[in-house]
């Protein structure tokens, strides 16, 4: 055993990964090494047995208490019944869950991982922690306390370790350099390479845009798209999702390169990369700084703490302005003043590009640190809205565009890219199976779907109709206005299918019969009570996370109380029982 420290993360949106990256920076500042960092699925399991002594896992929970996609293989392995109970007896373990207590299966993933690893012989390194994002202290508050206990435990194991100077620039993790030859690559000549060279890797397929039409009225603030594309050999079911792989816009990449003159001079020279970070689908075969920033590195997301913790090292403090800017960036990269980072980056939704442009006068970033500094562009997931087809996919996508408190327009990286796609354009995508499954057993289905939550419900409804099933479907849909964002009017105008029962709520129409979906549900208490209690109906709830899923569940509890005469406790247990039996499912994002 070599005494290695291994940090593994399971992350769907990047939050858990960010804490893992930041923790590695913090441990390196104590000269603790070697330290490995990888997703749960990317780290070789054999090394956990042969090299790792101290295992740190940071993991979020997604969907119905599920492990993030980059941790599913790891979870499948450790759940094998034939594994010996002393397999990991050499490992000392601590875990950190990134969660939100508004979800029923709060921090469920890290609980499962921690419990199973302890069953396989792990010893406790420092106390586990389950952070709650909606608590007053937020995830940071939990993390600070957990990290302090972890570092104290590790320093006890490594008595020779000590805090090194904060001024020392850490060595880059990834090896990137510019070719010394005089060769330059014309971006127009390799425009297809980032797509073609990645096809087939990690299940990536080629999609061709068929339609990209606006569903909402032109005078409505929200642009919602009906996005259809074709491909070959498709295999999906209602509830499955598509991951789209967007890219940055040329004007943004140009602005970034111009902010660092030393980059602009070599922007189209071939790059030499070794020790790549993991990226779903891999990197393009032909890379320059320009193509790396366009197709692989996220320059439009909000900069995170680990970004600033490295960035401040590259500011020239020889002038008064430089010294002040370096100090400011250092504060943003520290946990000592978390509100400073929030006010600068999160509150105004400031992008990485905007940050670099603001500090460009005193900032010189070495090429060798680019992969350490910039996050990777993540694929974005969308629920499939079409009934199963081997040739086509339909998505319902809300375009992210809004003004911040500083009156600047912000646009989502993926939806801005998607909005500009035209029929015939090609792009990369992959399909993921979901636990949100439909089974035609003739029992009724109650569907609750405000806004774009309609997408997976549309897939299900269209399949039932196409198969001429006798299954009764009850859809409770919510939006703001009947005439502006009434998506079901676009999909089932003049519905004549006797199996499909539509009820709509319009929150901003003063003459609407129901304001919210929960109002419509409660108004149909007698019907829903009969469907649930007497006909074993299933309930599917889809849409934005937050208040909606919680209030819908409370409404179902009230309906059960009203229909059966149960008290509050028994009605809650009944709904929990439906969840445990797979008859009540939520898909919130």
Swiss-Prot record:
Class of this enzyme: oxidoreductase
UniProt GO BP: cellular response to oxidative stress; iron-sulfur cluster assembly; nitric oxide biosynthetic process; positive regulation of nitric oxide biosynthetic process
Listed name of the protein: NADPH-dependent diflavin oxidoreductase 1
UniProt xrefs under InterPro entries: CysJ-like_FAD-binding, FAD-bd_FR_type, Flavdoxin-like, Flavodoxin/NO_synth, Flavoprot_Pyr_Nucl_cyt_Rdtase, Flavoprotein-like_sf, FNR_nucleotide-bd, NADPH_Cyt_P450_Rdtase_alpha
Record's subunit section: Interacts with DRE2; as part of the cytosolic iron-sulfur (Fe-S) protein assembly (CIA) machinery.
Reaction(s) the record says it catalyses: 2 oxidized [2Fe-2S]-[protein] + NADPH = 2 reduced [2Fe-2S]-[protein] + NADP(+) + H(+)
Cofactor dependency: FAD; FMN
Residues annotated for NADP(+) binding in this entry: 452, 507-508
GO MF assignments: flavin adenine dinucleotide binding; FMN binding; NADP binding; NADPH-hemoprotein reductase activity; oxidoreductase activity
Role played: NADPH-dependent reductase which is a central component of the cytosolic iron-sulfur (Fe-S) protein assembly (CIA) machinery. Transfers electrons from NADPH via its FAD and FMN prosthetic groups to the [2Fe-2S] cluster of DRE2, another key component of the CIA machinery. In turn, this reduced cluster provides electrons for assembly of cytosolic iron-sulfur cluster proteins. Positively controls H(2)O(2)-induced cell death.
Keywords: Cytoplasm, FAD, Flavoprotein, FMN, Mitochondrion, NADP, Oxidoreductase
One Gene Ontology cellular component: cytosol
Superkingdom: Eukaryota
Species of origin: Candida albicans (strain SC5314 / ATCC MYA-2876) (Yeast)
Family, as annotated: Belongs to the NADPH-dependent diflavin oxidoreductase NDOR1 family.
Protein localization: Cytoplasm; Mitochondrion
List of residues binding FMN: 11-16, 60-63, 98-107, 133
HAMAP family xref list: NDOR1
């Amino acid at each position: 055993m070599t005494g290695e420290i291994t940090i593994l993360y399971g992350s769907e949106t990047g939050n858990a990964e960010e804490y893992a990256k930041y923790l590695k920076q913090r441990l390196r500042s104590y000269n603790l090494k070697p330290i490995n960092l990888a997703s749960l699925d990317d780290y070789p399991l054999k090394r956990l047995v042969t090299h790792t002594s101290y295992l740190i896992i940071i993991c979020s929970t997604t969907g119905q208490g599920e492990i993030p996609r980059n941790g599913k293989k790891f979870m499948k392995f450790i759940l094998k019944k034939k594994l010996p109970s002393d397999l990991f007896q050499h490992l000392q373990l601590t875990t950190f869950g990134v969660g939100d207590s508004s979800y029923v299966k709060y921090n469920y993933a890290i609980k499962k991982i921690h419990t199973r690893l302890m069953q396989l012989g792990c010893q406790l390194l420092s106390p586990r922690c389950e952070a709650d994002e909606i608590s007053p202290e937020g995830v940071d508050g939990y993390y600070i306390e957990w990290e302090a206990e972890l570092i104290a435990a590790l320093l006890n194991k490594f008595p020779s370790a000590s805090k090194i100077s904060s001024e020392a620039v850490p060595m880059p993790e990834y090896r990137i350099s510019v070719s010394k030859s005089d060769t330059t690559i014309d971006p127009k000549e390799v425009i297809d390479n980032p797509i073609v060279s990645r096809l087939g890797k990690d299940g990536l397929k080629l999609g061709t845009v068929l339609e990209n039409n606006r569903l909402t009225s032109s005078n409505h603030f929200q642009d919602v798209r009906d996005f259809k594309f074709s491909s070959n050999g498709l295999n999906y079911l209602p509830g499955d999702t598509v991951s789209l792989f967007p890219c940055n816009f040329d004007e943004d990449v140009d602005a970034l390169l111009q902010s660092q003159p030393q980059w602009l001079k070599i922007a189209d020279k071939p790059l030499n990369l070794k020790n790549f970070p993991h990226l779903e689908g891999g990197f393009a075969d032909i890379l320059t700084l320009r193509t790396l920033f366009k197709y692989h590195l996220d320059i439009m997301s909000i900069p995170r703490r680990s970004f600033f913790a490295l960035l401040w090292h590259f500011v020239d403090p020889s002038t008064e302005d430089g010294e002040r800017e370096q100090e400011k960036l250092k504060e943003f990269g520290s946990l000592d003043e978390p509100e400073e980072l929030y006010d600068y980056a999160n509150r105004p939704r400031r992008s990485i590009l905007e940050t670099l442009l603001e500090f460009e006068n005193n900032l010189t970033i070495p090429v060798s640190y680019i992969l350490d500094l910039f996050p990777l562009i993540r694929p974005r997931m969308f629920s499939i809205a079409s009934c199963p087809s081997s040739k086509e996919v339909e998505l319902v996508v809300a375009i992210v565009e809004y003004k911040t408190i500083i009156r600047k327009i912000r646009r989502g990286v993926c939806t801005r890219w998607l909005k500009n796609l035209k029929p015939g354009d090609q792009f990369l995508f992959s399909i993921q199976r979901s636990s949100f499954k439909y089974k035609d057993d003739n029992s009724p289905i109650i569907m609750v779907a405000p806004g774009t939550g309609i997408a997976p419900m549309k897939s299900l409804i269209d399949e039932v109709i196409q198969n001429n099933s006798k299954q009764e479907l009850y859809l409770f849909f919510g939006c703001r206005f009947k005439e502006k964002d009434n998506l079901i009017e676009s999909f089932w105008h003049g519905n004549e299918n006797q199996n499909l029962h539509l009820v709509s709520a319009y929150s901003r129409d003063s003459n609407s019969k129901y304001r919210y979906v929960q109002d419509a549900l409660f108004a149909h208490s007698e019907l829903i009570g009969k469907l649930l209690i007497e006909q074993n109906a299933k309930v599917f709830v889809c849409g934005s996370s937050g208040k909606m899923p919680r209030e819908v569940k409370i409404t179902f509890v009230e309906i059960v109380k009203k229909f059966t005469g149960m008290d509050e406790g028994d009605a809650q247990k009944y709904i929990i029982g439906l969840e445990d039996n797979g008859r009540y499912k939520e898909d919130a994002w």
